[in-house]
């Protein structure tokens, strides 16, 4: 029954022209990552469509302003997309579309996913590495931002490593307080805008509640929404 409902939902989406695409295929976690990405996309004033390998078509980009990549498993997402979908996403961005990624969505942006041999999108030069080992997560991490300290939900996300030349093309939005490693960045690829975060600004309250952790400065959904607005030029 659940599969039937999901199928009907995906079919209903195809009737309308959507201006935001959210990956909902393999690699997007099934524990609220897709729904959270959809929520902050709507908060940004956009009309999202969930995209999977089964319903993907390049024509979807004709009305889209931004591609949103949720948290989950970046390697699984890349493999499920395959070369065809990855190239279509890159083409979309280079021609002026936006890309927003949270956690796994940040891992996916570099030429290789993290420190693996899995092919990434290659829309951000540099490398991604896991901020710290998985033991003891999820957690709330203290971040350094241009506006002062901020606390973010973290669950296995990356930090970015750039050389001096690559860094000139990057606008650093936040760093991990403990290591000063780069967490969130804005940059461009061709005519398009990219905004990604190793942490989860889209995290809903129930993620914190389930893990018995507290974000002392409140939810960061507005940050996630602003990322989408900027990338979508909305």
Can you say where each PLM-predicted feature lies in the sequence?
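Class I SAM-dependent methyltransferase SAM-binding "motif I" and its flanking Rossmann-like core
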Residues: 110-151
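Extracellular ligand-binding/catalytic regions of CAZymes and related secreted enzymes
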Residues: 90, 199-234
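Catalytic beta-strand/loop cores that center a nucleophilic Ser/Cys/Thr
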Residues: 138-206
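Short beta-strand segments enriched in small/hydrophobic residues
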Residues: 19-25
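Short catalytic/ligand-binding loop motif for oxyanion handling, primarily in non-cytosolic enzymes
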Residues: 76-77, 108-111, 117, 131-132, ...
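Helical hinge/lid and interdomain linker segments adjacent to catalytic or ligand-binding clefts
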Residues: 21, 30-113
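Sec-dependent N-terminal signal peptides
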Residues: 3-12
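Sec/Tat signal peptide C-region and signal peptidase I cleavage site
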Residues: 13-17
């Amino acid at each position: 029954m659940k599969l039937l409902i999901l199928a009907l939902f995906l079919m209903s989406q195809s009737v309308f022209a959507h201006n935001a695409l959210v990956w909902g295929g393999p690699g997007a976690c099934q524990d609220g990552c897709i729904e959270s990405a959809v929520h902050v996309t709507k908060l940004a004033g956009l009309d999202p469509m969930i995209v999977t390998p089964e319903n993907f078509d390049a024509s979807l980009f004709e009305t889209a302003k931004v591609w949103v990549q949720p948290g989950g498993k970046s390697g699984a997402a890349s493999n499920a997309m395959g070369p065809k979908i990855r190239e279509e996403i890159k083409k979309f961005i280079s021609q002026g579309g936006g890309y927003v990624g949270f956690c796994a969505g940040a891992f996916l942006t570099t030429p290789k996913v993290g420190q693996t041999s899995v092919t990434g999108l290659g829309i951000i030069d540099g490398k991604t590495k896991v901020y710290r080992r998985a033991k003891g997560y999820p957690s709330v991490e203290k971040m350094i931002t241009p506006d002062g300290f901020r606390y973010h939900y973290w669950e296995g996300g990356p930090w970015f490593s750039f050389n001096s030349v690559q860094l000139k093309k990057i606008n650093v939005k936040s760093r991990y307080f403990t290591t000063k490693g780069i967490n969130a960045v804005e940059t461009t690829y061709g005519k398009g805008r990219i905004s990604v975060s190793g942490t989860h600004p889209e995290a809903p309250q129930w993620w914190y509640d389930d893990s018995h952790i507290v974000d002392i400065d409140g939810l960061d959904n507005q940050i996630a929404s602003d990322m989408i607005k900027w990338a979508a030029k909305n």
